[in-house]
Amino acid sequence: MDKIKLGFVPTRRSIFSAPDAIKYRGLTADRLREIGVDIVDIDDINDEGLLFDDSHIEPIVKKFRAEGVDGIMLCHANFGTEYVCARLARELGLPVLLWGPRDERPEPDGTRLRDSQCGLFATGKVLRRFQVPFTYMTNCRLTDPEFERGVWDFLAVCNVVKTFKRTRILQMATRPFDFWSTMCNEGELLERFNIQLSPIPMTELVQAVRDAQADEQAMAAMLAHIADSFEICIPEDKVPAVAGLAIAMKRLVEKYGCNAGAIQCWNALQDELGIMPCAANAILNEMGIPIVCETDIHGAITALMVEAADLGRHRGMFADWTVRHPDNENGELLQHCGPWPCSCAAVKPKLTYPLAFDHPGALTAEAKHGDLTLARFDGDNGEYSLLLGNARGIDGPAGMGTYLWVEVENLKRLEAKIVEGPYIHHCVAIHANVVPVLYEACKYIGIQPDLYDSIEEDVKAYLRGE
């Protein structure tokens, strides 16, 4: 599972009980550690370990940056000091979780010790004034289930934001000429999102494969992995090319400091190596290095986002929306020539030939059924959005490639969204419900969430703890 560091920032206000604020900052820190959160505390910033003065901001910022914090939690141990919270949040520029523990029953004489809820109202407004996006977790008790759920969902949001803003994609050759739908604006991706591409020509990839094939130790290990992972249904003399391509792509990803890749797939690669790249893609995808087809840069971005939203617990499946189910009005075939990781398959994949080409190197296997999230990051004309929603695996006719028949709530609505854009026929599926996390992450990365199901109010209700 991916690791996320949370900066823990408890805050108080002078007119309410300092001892009670100190008590709750300790209880909250203990609870966060109990549920497995890696926190960076401010208990060394001052004697109370609380934020309530401008002088605390600089040392907190310095500490959090040195520790590599990925997001911060503004914990209102009492009412809190809203303007100091906002100044800190703006200076850090990280995702913000706003929360305060539910207030106790007032004292017999009517005295209230904390008024944490009231402080949340104030801080929410001031964060807006400072134009700081934030995530609100409902005012609840530390032992309430929505506390643990909300914290972990926020950590997943932080993971999406961190991954998105640090994306660098290995682009292996140009897009295929016939695939105008996969064109992207490299300059705009860099200017708006800090998403970088590392383009290399096909000749560099082919040479890297030749170099890999000359490495006997690396080849022996990869060939053993292939024999263990796949049922081999292609000529034995073609398997080393699959192994060499997998090794080469991994080395190139590391050489250029990338976290994903996109490959041309056809036809130049077949002229040089005599194979399709699908199985090699699947091997890297299983490693947590998304490699997508047809040089689909936006598809690679989607794969990174979807896996980050699940904290790396499951692997994504880069797929085509292809044809409608012959019997189910809301059924659709997700399929591609074979880049899906083995962990997603319901059976041992066959290393074989693809549907539309004569060269070996594809995989065939039906994916596991179950509940899924489907997503697609895309854009055109300067506007970017994230199409997302739920689906479930269903039975259907046997297929070729890696495939899964799925059912959605309303296929006609989804179909119209894809056609009318800015999306294309590619998406990424994952065996997890990460719709709320992706929806919330969009506010931090400057894109619009676009739900293809009529569930927006349900998603908002989930996020606020209902």
Model-identified regions with their sequence ranges:
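Extended hydrophobic packing segments that form well-structured cores
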Residues: 358-466
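N-terminal beta-loop-helix "entrance" segment that forms/cooperates
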Residues: 37-67, 207-216
